[in-house]
Swiss-Prot record:
An MF annotation (GO) of this entry: nuclease activity
Origin organism lineage: Bacteria, Bacillati, Cyanobacteriota, Cyanophyceae, Synechococcales
Enzyme Commission code(s) on record: 3.1.-.-
Protein name: Putative pre-16S rRNA nuclease
GO biological process: rRNA 5'-end processing
Coarse class of the protein's main subcellular location: cytoplasm
SUPFAM superfamilies per the UniProt record, alphabetical: Ribonuclease H-like
Superkingdom: Bacteria
Compartment(s): Cytoplasm
Source organism (scientific name): Synechococcus sp. (strain CC9605)
GO cellular component, one term: cytosol
Function, in words: Could be a nuclease involved in processing of the 5'-end of pre-16S rRNA.
Length: 158
């Protein structure tokens, strides 16, 4: 089921950078944004709050790197903690998207294989957002996704 269109900030959370992408309020145009070089959470939050205010963001989409069998990886657990903390700090609902192979796909699609500037991370975030706009699931308050997020991304229950 397609989610209700609204302005979204999509995050491809990595250990060094966070790829960012946004869409317009109608969910028509997805735009990769400048990637954020990771710092302390409070410093990241200042930058992400500014993006949210500037773009009138109404929700977050966070990629979860699941393995080929759809099971959470160690990095997925990190992304989950970060996404929940961010959604709570920004008071925004969120949805999870399975990002298995998204970085590889973005590298292939946009000719960015091996890029270390952050453009590849943001291209991956854009692909995640396009996937979410096409498939959902609906955004949910962070506290509702926290207890059910282990079920996997993109299954409607996370």
């Amino acid at each position: 089921m397609r989610p209700r269109p609204c302005s979204i900030l999509s995050l491809d959370v990595g250990r060094r950078r966070i790829g960012l992408a946004g869409c317009d309020a109608l969910g028509i145009s997805v735009t990769p944004l400048a990637a954020l070089r990771r710092g302390r959470f409070d410093a990241d939050l200042v930058v992400l709050q500014a993006h949210c205010c500037e773009r009138s963001v109404q929700g977050l989409v966070v990629g979860l790197p699941l393995d080929a069998a759809g099971q959470p990886t160690a990095q997925a657990e990190h992304c989950q903690r970060y996404g929940l903390r961010l959604a709570a700090a920004l008071d925004l609902p969120l949805a999870w998207v399975n990002e298995h192979s998204s970085t590889w796909a973005a590298g292939e699609q946009f000719g960015l294989k091996g890029d270390r500037s952050g453009r590849l991370d943001s291209a991956a975030a854009a692909l995640l957002l396009e996937q979410w706009l096409a498939e959902g699931p609906e955004l949910k308050p962070a506290q509702q996704t926290a207890s059910r997020s282990g079920a996997g991304a993109g299954d409607g229950g996370s």
